Curated annotation (Swiss-Prot):
This is Uracil phosphoribosyltransferase. The keyword Nuclease does not apply. PANTHER family: ADENINE PHOSPHORIBOSYLTRANSFERASE (PTHR32315), URACIL PHOSPHORIBOSYLTRANSFERASE, CHLOROPLASTIC (PTHR32315:SF4). CDD domains: PRTases_typeI (cd06223). Gene3D superfamilies: 3.40.50.2020. One of its GO terms (biological process) is uracil salvage. Pathway: Pyrimidine metabolism; UMP biosynthesis via salvage pathway; UMP from uracil: step 1/1. The keyword Nucleotide-binding applies. The gene is upp. Pfam families: UPRTase (PF14681). Its cofactor is Mg(2+). GO terms for molecular function: GTP binding; magnesium ion binding; uracil phosphoribosyltransferase activity. It comes from Brucella abortus (strain S19).
Amino acid sequence: MGVTVVSHPLVKHKLTIMRKKETSTASFRRLLKEISLLLCYEVTRNLELTTMSIETPLMPMEAPVLEGKKLVFASILRAGNGLLEGMLDLVPAARVAHIGLYRDHDTLQPIEYYFKAPEDIVNRLVIVVDPMLATANSAIAAIDKLKERGATNIRFLCLLAAPEGIERFTKAHPDVEVFTASIDECLDEKGYIVPGLGDAGDRMYGTK
């Protein structure tokens, strides 16, 4: 399906401020909400529409509305939750799934500790969210789990992606399109995206 880099000037500007090491936790969290709304606009751009009959104050008309079942936003915990607020502001009727994964700092492999998703996920568009696509191990594991539950229409949304992560992800899930605000240079020896923005979860919640 490929990779879409969202190159809107507001996205670029806000991402630059998020990258700055002196940006406060409060500002980082606010910017993450703002940029997630802009990214959500792009990832939902080609949703299918149908029409319904309505009446305006002046006359009846056939008007466009979204077709099919509501979206599912699937957050990879914990940092993925930072993207949810802005996305739910844009699509308040969306269902939400939570996938609890953390990365073993020695092996860089994901360890699952929680999974909760709507039961009728089979016929829904699922947008998986995580700020960083670094090694891609967590993203691959999350989508593996969603596919086990029957999801077939999946997209992945992140702030930053590493070329190594994109390569691994697209090999594992060639049917899942990736949307990102930036493709950075590479991964360092610890598996962090560089130049990156640090640990998104720590910066969002003020932890280390």
